[in-house]
Amino acid sequence: MAARLVVDAKCSYPAACNAVETLLWDPEATAALDSCVSALSAQGVELRGCKETRKRHPQMNAATGADWDTEYGALILSIRQVAGLDQALAHIARHGSRHTDVIVTQDPVAATRFLAEVDSACVFHNASNRFSDGYRFGLGAEVGISTDKLHARGPVGVEGLLTYRWVLYGHGQVTTDYGPGGRHYIHKDLPVDG
């Protein structure tokens, strides 16, 4: 599942603001890393790895400190090994854009913690970050994005004080499955407890 998600997240539209820029991996997930590297390489993605990642995949370029903070807008992806969820959360808190972050795991406890603790506008479990899109959320045409928590200026009414955080639980969905000849988005109001 990880390889399919990361290929969609990087290759379906690499210049998009919701394209993945950094892949973090746990040392217990070497098989998933290997399949991601293979799939991304087959798509022509330039991979830049940390020292630990390059020990496993010496063919990739060395990542620099700047890579962890770069929005490439191209077929380039940085890859970093992290020692567990705590280190992943710390990396995201320091280097993340606060736009969209994804965890790919079968561990529901880790997923729940990730979704609760990552301070991004959109946090997803087992789904491509390319789903982070106004149209896909049923908001109509997207006129802009914000990673700030309060974005209103000038006179502010109640609507101007509201912000949204999107949480998506998935089962391996990718955006390339949707569109002409494929699956369709369904936009409908859902009951909200509150």
Feature map (PLM): residue ranges:
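ALDH superfamily catalytic-core signature
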Residues: 1-74, 125
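Conserved C-terminal structural/oligomerization subdomain of aldehyde/semialdehyde dehydrogenase
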Residues: 5, 64-194
